[in-house]
């Protein structure tokens, strides 16, 4: 990135961020040079990548000298670098106002020229004009501030391609080793093929005893023309199948028990709900008061049992047959 600054003249001088110390040590030279120039102000900003530009304090040569110089040939090392942008650099032009005194406008007919545009040329031409501030020699293409994206990206691609190739080789080797292992296992571990007679004899032996001692195993292997290891493996598999079947039967039994318990629980919950409903609802029958005297409406008089036995009998019959209505008790009449 460069920052070019000019004051009103047509010279294409650029001022970068890293100025020489000579300009700072000799302020008189800079003051005299600026006094002879117009008060125009121009600032240019240039950004370049790859091997085209680098940060260095340099003053560009004149346009005529640059046109006379032959174009430098691109080096082989620059083939992978990103080409720099063709767009012109950004420029900022500032003019002084008209209220300044006329003697400060310069010596060019009282007119202040516009800011001179800085032209960015090739790096080799710039470095030949003014030496760079970097550690590398002036005519070198690269510097410490150069951003070389092309070579970095190319190197990254090469490393990634190499890594992919190595991974592919490892995967192919692992597949080959797995296939070899499978072939070896297949040759050594073949499935045992038994005839019907051998299977029936082994089944009968398993019903008698599910486990075999070494002597029984050897005798059974000789009788069936098999190896002792094959007989042992058959018994192990038969015990595993028996255990699996028993486990399946137990699971089915537990499943049925769980279903029956679920149905019973649902029925009990339904009964509890019905009982709670009956408890909270009103009763269907009417309760009679405890301390009331009931009397038949046809019997208005109460007589003693000795005086009128027939009347009391009729009264009792009436109480048993007629409807009962609660009435208030009356005092008994005295018979004179």
Swiss-Prot record:
Gene Ontology cellular-component terms listed: nucleus
Subcellular location, record wording: Nucleus
Annotated region (Leucine-zipper), positions in chain: 254-275
Residue ranges of the annotated DNA-binding region, renumbered to this chain: 187-246
Domain of life: Eukaryota
Main location as per UniProt: nucleus
Coiled-coil segments: none
Compositionally skewed regions (Acidic residues) per UniProt: 120-129
Gene3D superfamilies linked to this entry: Homeodomain-like (1.10.10.60)
GO molecular function, one term: DNA-binding transcription factor activity, RNA polymerase II-specific
Pfam families, per the entry: HALZ, Homeodomain
Region (Disordered): 53-141, 160-194
Keywords: DNA-binding, Homeobox, Nucleus, Transcription, Transcription regulation
Biased composition (Basic and acidic residues): 64-81, 160-173
Keyword Ribonucleoprotein: no
Biological role stated in the UniProt entry: Probable transcription factor.
Family: Belongs to the HD-ZIP homeobox family. Class II subfamily.
Protein name as catalogued: Homeobox-leucine zipper protein HAT14
The organism of origin for this protein: Arabidopsis thaliana (Mouse-ear cress)
High-level lineage: Eukaryota, Viridiplantae, Streptophyta, Embryophyta, Tracheophyta
């Amino acid at each position: 990135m460069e920052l070019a600054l000019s004051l009103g003249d047509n010279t294409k001088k650029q001022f970068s961020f890293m100025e020489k110390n000579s300009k700072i040590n000799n302020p008189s030279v800079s003051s005299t040079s600026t006094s002879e120039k117009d008060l125009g102000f121009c600032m240019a900003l240039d950004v370049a990548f790859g091997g085209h530009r680098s940060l260095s304090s340099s003053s560009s040569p004149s346009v005529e000298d640059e046109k006379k110089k032959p174009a430098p040939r691109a080096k082989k090392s620059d083939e992978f670098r990103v080409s720099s942008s063709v767009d012109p650099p950004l420029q900022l032009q500032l003019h002084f106002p008209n209220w300044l005194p006329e003697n400060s406008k310069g010596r060019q007919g009282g007119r202040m020229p516009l800011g001179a545009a800085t032209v960015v040329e090739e790096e080799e031409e710039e470095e030949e004009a003014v030496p760079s501030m970097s550690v590398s020699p002036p005519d070198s293409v690269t510097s410490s501030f150069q951003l070389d994206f092309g070579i970095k990206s190319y190197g990254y691609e090469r490393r990634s391609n190499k890594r992919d190739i190595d991974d592919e080789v490892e995967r192919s080797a692992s597949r080959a080793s797995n296939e070899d292992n499978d072939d070896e296992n297949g040759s050594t571990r073949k499935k045992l093929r038994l005839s019907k007679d051998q299977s029936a004899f082994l089944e009968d032996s398993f019903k008698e005893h599910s486990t075999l001692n070494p002597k029984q195993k050897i005798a059974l292997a000789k009788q069936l023309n098999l190896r002792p290891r094959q007989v042992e493996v058959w018994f192990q598999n038969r015990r595993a199948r028996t255990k699996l079947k028993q486990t399946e039967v137990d699971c089915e039994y537990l499943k049925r028990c769980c279903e029956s318990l679920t149905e019973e629980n649902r029925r009990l919950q339904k009964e509890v709900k019905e009982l709670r409903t009956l408890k909270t609802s009103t009763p269907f029958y009417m309760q009679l008061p405890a301390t009331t005297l009931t009397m038949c409406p046809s019997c208005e008089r109460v007589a003693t049992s000795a005086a009128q036995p027939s009347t009391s009998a009729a009264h009792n019959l009436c109480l048993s047959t007629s409807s009962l209505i609660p009435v208030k008790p009356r005092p008994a009449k005295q018979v004179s």
